Amino acid sequence: MAYIQLEPLNEGFLSRISDVLLCGWTCQHCCQRCYESSCCQSSEDEVEILGPFPAQTPPWLMASRSNDKDGDSVHTASDVPLTPRTNSPDGRRSSSDTSKSTYSLTRRISSLDSRRPSSPLIDIKPIEFGVLSAKKEPIQPSVLRRTYTPDDYFRKFEPRLYSLDSNLDDVDSLTDEEIMSKYQLGMLHFSTQYDLLHNHLTVRVIEARDLPPPISHDGSRQDMAHSNPYVKICLLPDQKNSKQTGVKRKTQKPVFEERYTFEIPFLEAQRRTLLLTVVDFDKFSRHCVIGKVAVPLCEVDLVKGGHWWKALIPSSQNEVELGELLLSLNYLPSAGRLNVDIIRAKQLLQTDVSQGSDPFVKIQLVHGLKLVKTKKTSFLRGTIDPFYNESFSFKVPQEELENASLVFTVFGHNMKSSNDFIGRIVIGQYSSGPSESNHWRRMLNTHRTAVEQWHSLRSRAECDRVSPASLEVT
């Protein structure tokens, strides 16, 4: 037979009654707290601190609150104890003291402003977002400093370095007829065509008209009999690989009909600017720039091509390029030999109107300020792009190499009179420029190896000014 153990009736009933009473007391207490919180709202900041503190507010905390309200005293860290004091003589807390309780610590915001800056207490103010203060403090001081300018400050400027030709500012907005009537430098007829199959640009210089006559040597009158124009073509910004037409004698209406090809990819050609410069070559071997035409190739249809008549505008480039020379240097320390190869030259300045140029190169070895040896190439007839490929050797001991200089001078051969000077460079101890110094330095660092480099020719006056070795040769 199974037995069932029954719970005593009285004990179960009493436990339920106690639970109901406890729940009712808890609900009443919570409702009272909510009512007090809703009815006692204020503008003060309430900081609720939970912990096993005495339910009664300690005296030290009451003193601090009263002082904050009055604003007459400031507590320092040494005046206020860090822990609350207990009233129990034996220092032990009763059971009511150890029970968890809550109390509110209230401070007025206005008390924060009443504290002096010397107070060690830290005030934390809320960050206001999107709120603009009516009173703004200036970042810069209200009193500005006076800028001191020396009396000779503006005297250091050179107006010629900053002067602009105002007449050229409105060239882009003028038509060719307006440019022609304003400057009266003439017109140039040319065409362009790009070959996609062979990746080259063809420029055809056809003719020019109404070119101004040159001025006589004394500058007193126009010299109608000595107008000898020619055209130089290049693709900016590259001015080294330029082309040059032949010289047309005694005319202001030259007909050139010459074609020139530039090996250049199509996309690169669209980033270039075609520059055609008309130059006059007189009987005194002076090369005077008449005018120029600049055409950005991105603005034209290169594949379709086209013909243009363009009015010449003034050019800021008064001096023309003298040409370039390709050299190779090699030194053999064991043999004490300095080997020089004259490979080629290009776009040399023309010196003879009737027969063109017959250029040759003279090489002169200068030790210190003393001329030691002179050699020269053969001359090539009727060309401004000569190809020599001639080698020369000079005896230079290694201990004398640092004092050696090589002077390269390009002349135009003339059967009737003395040879015409075209250009010069100096390489060695007294180099005529940075490019020449770099070539010499590379040769010294790489013995037994030929070092090639292009050099732009310079005028005689420029070389004489910067290189003492140029003064020792003719």
UniProtKB/Swiss-Prot annotation:
> Which PROSITE patterns does UniProt cross-reference here?
C2
Q: Which InterPro entries match?
A: C2_dom, C2_domain_sf, Synaptotagmin, Synaptotagmin-15/17_C2A, Syt17_C2B
Question: What functional role does this protein have?
Answer: Plays a role in dendrite formation by melanocytes.
Q: What is the lineage of its organism?
A: Eukaryota, Metazoa, Chordata, Craniata, Vertebrata
Q: Which residues form the C2 domain?
A: 184-310, 321-455
Tissue expression summary: Expressed in brain and kidney.
Gene3D superfamilies named among the record's database cross-references:
C2 domain
Region (Disordered) residue ranges read 60-117
Q: Which UniProt keywords apply?
A: Differentiation, Membrane, Phosphoprotein, Repeat
Q: Where in the cell is it found?
A: Membrane
Spans of biased composition, class Low complexity?
A: 96-117
Show the GO MF annotations: calcium ion sensor activity; calcium-dependent phospholipid binding; SNARE binding
Source species of the chain: Rattus norvegicus
Q: Which gene encodes it?
A: Syt17
Q: What is this protein called?
A: Synaptotagmin-17
Key word Membrane present: yes
Q: Give yes or no: UniProt keyword Repeat.
A: yes
Q: Sites of the modification Phosphoserine?
A: S118, S119
**Which Gene Ontology biological process is one annotated for this entry?**
vesicle-mediated transport
Membrane topology label: Peripheral membrane protein
- The record's principal subcellular location, in a coarse class, is membrane
UniProt GO cellular component terms: exocytic vesicle; glutamatergic synapse; plasma membrane; postsynapse; trans-Golgi network
Tell me which family the UniProt entry assigns to this protein: Belongs to the synaptotagmin family.
